Design a protein with these regions (language model features):
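Conserved HGGG/HGGXW glycine-rich cap/lid loop of the alpha/beta-hydrolase fold
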Residues: 50-99
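Conserved hydrolase catalytic core segment
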Residues: 126-164
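Active-site nucleophile elbow and catalytic-triad environment of alpha/beta-hydrolase enzymes
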Residues: 196-212
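Conserved loop-alpha-helix segment in the C-terminal half of the alpha/beta-hydrolase fold
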Residues: 226-253
Length: 287
């Protein structure tokens, strides 16, 4: 069971830092940060059958930041202090993750997306900027499709549209399916049920078509690493399918762009939010 838990950590967004720091006998900054357990900044919202935990930082235009599979608010230790200088940063532990406990059997990206929309309604926010990492990027895309009035501008990194080897690195895709099968064979327990729900998302979700992406009208920055878990050609397809989009592929980068390329990541997204979207066509393509 311990081995299975370790494997789950490897795929989670926090694991990259944890594994690297473990090799040097260091402690992950995500384990010691106040973010994700800040009593002064955190609250619960009772919505859609769960108590959704969220934290807010800073003042200014609202900015929603969404974590990935098995993650939490503390995954954004490098984004919160940067963006809180000029934005009101809102982060939630997605359903069935972090402090947002969900004892139900089902979990989907659509459920998590509608949770976030309900949270924005509760906070009386008509619209906001959005950053999504990994599964959080999927939620960001769905938020822009299902609740288009809520998203002013969107930046996603490491998102995918479907659970196939054409989108996800074949090694990771096959691992997720095999791990799901292994978990299903274990005796049921609250912890195991939670892990099954999360791994099922990796192995069998989402199901978004390129035609659906064309419904996204807000300016969108699509980000990925050239050695990302999400294949670069799939990231390019996402950008090509969204009418008002930019594409940014980081060289020598994997899936954890907000961590290992945090300075570039933060400044590039900040500039994208602050500047008008520029439609590039015709002779403008020579610029």
């Amino acid at each position: 069971m311990k081995i299975l838990k370790l494997l789950l950590l490897i795929i989670s967004v926090t694991s990259v830092v944890n594994v690297c720091l473990a090799q040097s006998d260091a402690v992950s900054p995500m384990d010691t940060t106040i973010y994700g357990r800040n009593k002064a900044a955190g609250k619960f919202i009772k919505t859609r059958g769960i108590n959704l935990y969220y934290e807010t930082y800073g003042e200014g235009e609202p900015l929603l930041i969404i974590h990935g599979n098995g993650g939490s608010i503390n995954n954004f230790i490098y984004q919160i202090p940067y963006f809180a200088k000029n934005y009101k940063v809102i982060l939630a532990d997605s359903r069935a993750q972090g402090k947002s406990v969900d004892k139900g059997d089902s979990l989907s990206y659509e459920m998590m997306t509608d949770d976030l929309n309900a949270m924005l309604d509760t906070l009386h926010l008509n619209n906001c900027y959005v950053i999504g990492w990994s599964d959080g990027g999927i939620n960001g895309l769905l938020l822009a499709m299902r609740h288009p009035d809520k998203v002013k501008k969107l930046a996603v990194t490491g998102a995918n549209l479907w659970p196939e080897a054409t989108a996800v690195d074949p090694f990771i895709y096959n691992w997720a399916k095999n791990y799901y099968d292994s978990l299903k064979k274990l005796p049921p327990s609250p912890n195991n049920i939670g892990n099954i729900k999360l791994i099922r998302l990796l192995a069998f979700e989402p199901h978004i078509t390129t035609k659906q992406l064309q419904k996204i009208k807000c300016p969108t920055l699509v980000i990925g690493g050239d050695h990302d878990v999400i294949l670069p050609q799939h990231t390019m397809l996402i950008a090509q399918s969204i009418p008002n989009s930019y594409l940014w592929i980081l060289p020598n980068s994997g899936h954890s762009t907000p961590i290992f390329y945090r300075e570039k990541f933060n400044t590039e997204i900040d500039n994208f939010f602050k500047n008008l979207y520029r439609k590039i066509d015709g002779f403008g393509r020579f610029n």
